[in-house]
Amino acid sequence: MERYQELTVLLLLLLLEGGSGGAGSFRPLCRPTNATLAAESDACPVCVTFTTTICAGYCPSMVRVLPAALPPGPQLVCTYRELTFSWIRLPGCPPGVDPIFSFPVALSCACGSCRLSHSDCGGPRARPHLCTRPHLSLRLL
């Protein structure tokens, strides 16, 4: 009976790890996540912070241990599968300055190659994007 319990515990651990041998433990997988972003323009007096949905999380990857004649394979990143765009109006912009700031809103996410046309694939930053001007917070969600 004790051997059966050990096997059950081992199986549960493997299922919780996703069969990744420990690589995925305690790391949230790629999914839509709420994040606060900042929008500002050099011509407008106010920075606006707002909350939207972005793609974030862990994507499994492999790195070759031994050198190979082949180039390294692409590293997967958490990126948009489906998205829509929303916008906010920056307040106080002078006439002739476009006050509209548009941004992507994640509907679903997937692990895939980075597409710089609509993703920032640079990894985590030491400091988040911050306002350099007086700021106003908007609640969009």
From Swiss-Prot:
Q: How does it assemble?
A: Heterodimer of a common alpha chain and a unique beta chain which confers biological specificity to thyrotropin, lutropin, follitropin and gonadotropin.
| Stored InterPro entries | Cystine-knot_cytokine, Glyco_hormone_CN, Gonadotropin_bsu, Gonadotropin_bsu_CS
Q: Which residues are glycosylated?
A: 34
**Compartment(s) where it occurs, according to its Swiss-Prot or TrEMBL record:** Secreted
Enumerate the SUPFAM superfamilies for this protein. Cystine-knot cytokines
Originating organism: Monodelphis domestica
The gene coding this protein: LHB
CDD domains assigned: GHB_like (cd00069)
Q: Does the keyword Secreted apply?
A: yes
**Gene Ontology CC entries for this record:** cytoplasm; extracellular space
In Swiss-Prot or TrEMBL terms, this protein is called Lutropin subunit beta
Q: Which cysteines are joined by disulfide bonds?
A: 30-78, 44-93, 47-131, 55-109, 59-111, 114-121
Q: Name one GO biological process term.
A: G protein-coupled receptor signaling pathway
| Highest taxon listed in the record's lineage | Eukaryota
Q: Which UniProt keywords apply?
A: Disulfide bond, Glycoprotein, Hormone, Secreted, Signal
